[in-house]
């Protein structure tokens, strides 16, 4: 049959179509040139440009009036829609499904958007992606699946990748399936360019997607956590670790009562402590920290390794150290009955716990005891057996003085407004094969809190000393809540029945929050209030610029006490050695402090993500054997898509709103999910049944019983 010649030809490019496209592009360039010529930024011009130039090159009046062009970062959802974050805009721009132009989570995109008033009178924004400026994600991890309508052909089938990350709603087609089976978990390189088709090239096959090993390896790869060191790095560490320990030129504290207290399984012992009571009731607290910078010279392989890794990472079954084990568990670790190089903060405290004076000295110690938290707690609460009492008999008088000082510091910190927002921590118990057989809530006693208080005191003293001496430092900072988040939190607290009239909605103090938490504890509502308080606050980070630490209520604070496992502490040690002790010019280390702060902040986020995901993996594996069981749980979070519920074993999971039965709506203002008959709130106790344990995504699904 003869085709109608008047119809468009989609099969090949015609000369006329080519001319039209060239004309359209020419008009676009001329318009941008004209706008730049009159001082308008073509990146922020408030009209449609490319897609809204019609066949005659005209732009509608509505577009010129209402629509804005801007560039931002795209965040996608599993449902296909997304949001774009713009600088200067309080709220993200909504991008409906079908208007993302193939953008993937993390891409930098050019969008056109408009603002409108919803039926409720709220001003909202909506837009569409017109161009992907740069690709944020280079690879994707997922499970290989096959359908006749998707992916690379093999025996009549086509293969595609179902991403582990639910935010990637487009399933990329595999360009090759050699050595790959359906059900394998792989990492693949994304092939971009076609906005309506996403492809990927296999890079690594981790194994069967339901296996623990495959998921573990995939998480490490996705978060960029490297397990092994190179031969050169190991050799350099071994060389420096072999250096003999000599007391010359250092404060010799080997005759003092100095010891460590740490977890039973810890091998990287950063810190040791000592305490003396002075005349007039004052205290001399010694916090002796492994002198790691001595073993990690500037510009060495190890120095670059520390900058790249940024932190040790603590998984359920292993520790991935920042430095090779010959240092982290060997030469630097303050093992008992071994001479060790340390950097000692000798701090004089008043009888009320106020810092009166602080000295920082290179030193040599010989720890007399390898203390364990559980054993020291047993001594404190009177349950220690004869074996424990015999082990600690030489230091029990010192421990009693230390506990007295800890209680003084605790009272001082509370009065200052330091916030205690402890979330439940899990202790996952593994059998000989590395399989979890039980999960319990980790308890913190006075021994853990004592060490924490002493380390906090040392960190504050060191930061203050460096600041007062105008010496660079890698500060630990925590900004106060932003006014909009603070206002939302105070509204929630007010609706819960708390008096918030004494707190400004523009700015609050740590004491304000501490007062609210105290009131919540009296009412038995500390969990929901703590959760919403955490949501209102920014995350702590590192900075070369001094800023307050809101959560601790301190004006000067740094991390000094864990240089084996944290770059921030190692950098601060190096600056102390080079500038404070050796007298080098402070400005020589200002840029180093900035680089270290940025690298440490990035590494911390990476490590926290990996630790959380590995922990969730083990929790899901453990709970796979308990599907169908019922648990008493606490509503730990409320969102538009359901309730998060946490049983006593901390294995948190979602009850989808669609499975609650009846017609429920999410009340964002009061953080509740309600129907006409029922209301679910943060902190409610509910009975749940485990319905699903998804090892691929590391998630649990419950239902209300």
Predicted regions and their residues:
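Charge-lined substrate channels and their catalytic hotspots, especially those that engage the 3′ end
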Residues: 2-286, 293-339, 370, 377-380, ...
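Electropositive polyanion-binding surfaces
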Residues: 2, 70, 177-178, 182, ...
């Amino acid at each position: 049959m003869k085709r109608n010649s008047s119809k468009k030809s989609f099969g090949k490019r015609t000369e006329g179509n080519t001319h039209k496209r060239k004309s359209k592009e020419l008009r676009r360039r001329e318009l941008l040139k004209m706008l730049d010529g009159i001082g308008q930024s073509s990146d922020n011009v408030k009209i449609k440009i490319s897609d809204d130039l019609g066949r005659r090159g005209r732009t509608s009046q509505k577009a010129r009036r209402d629509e804005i062009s801007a560039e931002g970062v795209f965040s996608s959802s599993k449902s296909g829609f997304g949001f774009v974050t713009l600088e200067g805009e309080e709220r993200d721009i909504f991008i409906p499904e079908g208007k993302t132009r193939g953008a993937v989570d993390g891409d930098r995109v050019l969008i056109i958007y408009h603002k409108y008033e919803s039926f409720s009178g709220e001003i909202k924004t909506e837009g569409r992606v017109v161009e992907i400026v740069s690709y944020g994600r280079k690879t994707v991890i997922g499970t290989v699946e096959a359908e006749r309508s998707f992916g690379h052909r093999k025996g009549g089938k086509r293969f595609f990748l179902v991403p582990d990350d639910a935010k990637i709603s487009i399933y990329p087609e595999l360009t090759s399936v050699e050595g790959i089976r359906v059900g394998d978990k792989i990492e693949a390189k994304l092939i971009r360019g076609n906005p309506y088709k996403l492809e990927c090239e296999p890079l690594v096959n981790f194994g069967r997607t339901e296996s623990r090993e495959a998921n573990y390896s995939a998480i490490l790869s996705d978060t960029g956590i490297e397990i092994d060191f190179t031969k050169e790095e190991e050799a350099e560490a071994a060389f420096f670790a072999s250096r003999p320990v000599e007391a010359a030129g250092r404060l010799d504290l080997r005759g003092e009562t100095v010891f460590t207290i740490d977890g039973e399984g810890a091998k990287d012992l950063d810190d040791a402590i000592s305490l003396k009571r002075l005349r007039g009731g004052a205290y001399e607290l010694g916090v002796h920290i492994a002198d790691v910078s001595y073993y990690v010279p500037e510009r060495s392989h190890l120095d670059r390794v520390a900058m790249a890794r940024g932190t040790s990472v603590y998984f359920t079954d292993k520790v991935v150290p920042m430095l090779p084990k010959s240092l982290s568990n060997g030469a630097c670790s303050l093992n008992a009955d071994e001479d060790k190089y340390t950097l000692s903060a000798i701090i004089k405290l008043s009888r009320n716990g106020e810092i009166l004076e602080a000295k920082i000295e290179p030193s040599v110690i010989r720890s007399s005891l390898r203390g364990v938290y559980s054993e020291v707690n047993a001594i404190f609460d009177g349950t220690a057996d004869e074996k424990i009492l015999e082990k600690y008999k030489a230091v029990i008088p010192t421990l009693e003085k230390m506990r007295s000082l800890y209680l003084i510091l605790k009272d001082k910190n509370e009065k200052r407004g330091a916030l205690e927002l402890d979330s439940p921590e899990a202790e996952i118990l593994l059998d000989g094969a590395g399989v979890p057989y039980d999960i319990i809530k980790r308890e913190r006693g006075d021994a853990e809190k004592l060490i924490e208080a002493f380390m906090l005191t040392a960190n504050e003293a060191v930061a203050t000393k460096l600041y007062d001496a105008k010496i660079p430092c890698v500060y630990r900072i925590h900004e106060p809540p932003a006014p909009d988040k603070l206002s939302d939190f105070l509204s929630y607290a007010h609706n819960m029945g708390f008096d918030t009239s004494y707190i400004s909605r523009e700015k609050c103090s740590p004491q304000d929050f501490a007062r609210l938490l105290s009131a919540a504890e009296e009412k038995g509502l500390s969990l929901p209030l703590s959760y919403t308080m955490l949501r209102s606050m920014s995350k702590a980070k590192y900075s070369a610029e001094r800023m307050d630490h809101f959560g601790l209520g301190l004006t000067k604070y740094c991390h000094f006490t864990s240089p084996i496992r944290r770059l921030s502490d190692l950098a601060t040690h190096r600056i102390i050695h080079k500038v404070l002790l050796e007298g080098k010019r402070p400005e020589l280390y200002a840029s180093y402090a900035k680089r270290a702060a940025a690298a440490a902040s990035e590494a911390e986020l990476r490590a926290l993500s990996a630790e959380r995901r590995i922990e969730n993996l083990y929790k899901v594996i453990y709970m796979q054997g308990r599907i169908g069981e019922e648990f008493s749980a606490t509503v730990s979070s409320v969102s538009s898509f359901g309730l998060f519920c946490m049983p006593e074993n901390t294995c948190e999971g979602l009850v989808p709103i669609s499975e609650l039965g009846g017609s429920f709506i999410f009340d964002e203002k009061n953080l509740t999910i309600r129907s006409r008959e029922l209301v679910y709130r943060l902190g409610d106790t509910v009975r749940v049944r485990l319905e699903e344990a998804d090892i691929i995504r590391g998630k649990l699904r419950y239902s209300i019983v």
